[in-house]
Amino acid sequence: MSRNYNDELQFLDKINKNCWRIKKGFVPNMQVEGVFYVNDALEKLMFEELRNACRGGGVGGFLPAMKQIGNVAALPGIVHRSIGLPDVHSGYGFAIGNMAAFDMNDPEAVVSPGGVGFDINCGVRLLRTNLDESDVQPVKEQLAQAMFDHIPVGVGSKGVIPMNAKDLEEALEMGVDWSLREGYAWAEDKEHCEEYGRMLQADPNKVSPRAKKRGLPQLGTLGAGNHYAEIQVVDEIFNEYAAKKMGIDHKGQVCVMIHSGSRGLGHQVATDALVAMEKAMKRDKIIVNDRQLACARIASPEGQDYLKGMAAAGNYAWVNRSSMTFLTRQAFAKVFNTTPDDLDLHVIYDVSHNIAKVEQHVVDGKERTLLVHRKGSTRAFPPHHPLIAVDYQLTGQPVLIGGTMGTCSYVLTGTEQGMTETFGTTCHGAGRALSRAKSRRNLDFQDVLDKLADMGIAIRVASPKLVMEEAPESYKNVTDVVNTCHDAGISKKAIKLRPIAVIKG
């Protein structure tokens, strides 16, 4: 017997202006409560989605995000609460923008590939330059073309960085250390990556031959979908101290943002794990509310295999972003006829938006070792946290929030409040408001391209039909999302960037 919309509302209450609680009973077997962060505009979207679902108008086979947050709260071993960030939207198993942490010392606790997502370690890297908007404006089209020529883009795109099967094995194990050894990265790049660009538990043997076959040609390529490289300029500085620590000291300074993940390799690792886990769930009698939430006990062979394979795919994504950084440095050096070093093309930071990792957190006054699943959400550690680079000890970890194509992006910093409320996690971007298919039906790609041109944005796109899926209209407003996190205190705004050129798959 399904409940109507008004029945559902009894399980929801507003904690404060930016946060709602989902009470136990909203879905069966909830071990903990759920919460989600919104402002007025985002709240309306969330409740509309729930109302439509109650009328039977489901979204392309996914449950509404609120239900998904509830179903995650019913997974074995979850602690504290299931958390939806302001950019939350329905996804496979977990909503995108839903994070949850599981107690490593609880033998029942699980790991769920749906809590990481198919694009393992999809993430963002931001590079700074010592160039000014006035330096780039006259050569903007050339620069966009040079980047488009240097970086292979699109669904089936193949990499230009020579790589054989042995190189791939090493890259999967070593992450950025491989790029460093091969001369595609600078030593200091590593300091400014989450996990220092290398997950140590990675085991290339846990990545199937099929996944490797998909990954080999794609290294150093920009995927399709929401992946892009953007030349941006600093539009606003909210926190001068933090910005200076990042090497940003004035409006108009030019930066480059690279948004990409583990391509076909990560997708295959996730698919392989889901198949193995369906069997393990029968064996271990694990019951979940939604079969997309396939999972395995953390300590089981399937759970361990997935974590080792996921770490290897994570390393692949860091190598991928390093390779694209190398190619970006080449493109800039060529256009400005100088060296990347002279252009100060340093990595400000590199964050992951889809990953699960073991972290120490204080829950109910006790320090616990947790497996933190972040899907469509970003680690945002506070000042003085031992896992962030020396340069950022006083500011808190930089958090990179990519807007959608042609809208603004943000750099935030982590807070102590985020540590207690959301396991040191904040939003990751804009979050979809329209499904991909709906975007293709409703929007015309020429309009989207013209609009970007009107805004003075140079654009290079490998597959124009994908442009509508990524049009700003398809997404929630990134400023709403970032302001909600800022007002809720789980991260603070530092810098706002706007695009002047977009290179896209």
From Swiss-Prot:
Subcellular location: Nucleus; Cytoplasm
Catalytic activity: a 3'-end 3'-phospho-ribonucleotide-RNA + a 5'-end dephospho-ribonucleoside-RNA + GTP = a ribonucleotidyl-ribonucleotide-RNA + GMP + diphosphate; a 3'-end 2',3'-cyclophospho-ribonucleotide-RNA + a 5'-end dephospho-ribonucleoside-RNA + GTP + H2O = a ribonucleotidyl-ribonucleotide-RNA + GMP + diphosphate + H(+)
Binding positions (Mn(2+) 2): C122, H259, H353
Gene Ontology CC: cytoplasm; cytosol; endoplasmic reticulum membrane; nuclear envelope; nucleoplasm; nucleus; tRNA-splicing ligase complex
Modification Phosphoserine occurs at: S300
Alphabetical UniProt keywords: Cytoplasm, GTP-binding, Isopeptide bond, Ligase, Manganese, Metal-binding, Nucleotide-binding, Nucleus, Phosphoprotein, tRNA processing, Ubl conjugation
Glycyl lysine isopeptide (Lys-Gly) (interchain with G-Cter in SUMO2) crosslink, residue number(s): K496
Induction record: Down-regulated in the epididymis upon castration.
InterPro entries: RtcB, RtcB-like_sf, RtcB_euk
Gene Ontology terms: biological process: in utero embryonic development; placenta development; tRNA splicing, via endonucleolytic cleavage and ligation
Binding positions (Mn(2+) 1): D119, C122, H227
Entry comment describing in which tissues the protein is expressed: Ubiquitously expressed. Highly expressed in the epididymis with predominant enrichment in the initial segment. During sexual maturation, it is expressed in the caput epididymides.
Superkingdom, natural source: Eukaryota
GO function terms (MF aspect): GTP binding; metal ion binding; RNA ligase (GTP) activity; vinculin binding
Enzyme Commission number: 6.5.1.8
Active site: H428
Binding, GMP: 226-230, 353-354, 402-405, 409, 428-431, 504
Similarity comment: family membership: Belongs to the RtcB family.
Reported function: Catalytic subunit of the tRNA-splicing ligase complex that acts by directly joining spliced tRNA halves to mature-sized tRNAs by incorporating the precursor-derived splice junction phosphate into the mature tRNA as a canonical 3',5'-phosphodiester. May act as an RNA ligase with broad substrate specificity, and may function toward other RNAs. Essential during post-implantation development of embryos.
Further information: Ligation probably proceeds through 3 nucleotidyl transfer steps, with 2',3'-cyclic phosphate termini being hydrolyzed to 3'-P termini in a step that precedes 3'-P activation with GMP. In the first nucleotidyl transfer step, RTCB reacts with GTP to form a covalent RTCB-histidine-GMP intermediate with release of PPi; in the second step, the GMP moiety is transferred to the RNA 3'-P; in the third step, the 5'-OH from the opposite RNA strand attacks the activated 3'-P to form a 3',5'-phosphodiester bond and release GMP.
Quaternary state and interactors: Catalytic component of the tRNA-splicing ligase complex.
Protein name: RNA-splicing ligase RtcB homolog
Protein species of origin: Mus musculus
UniProt lineage: Eukaryota, Metazoa, Chordata, Craniata, Vertebrata
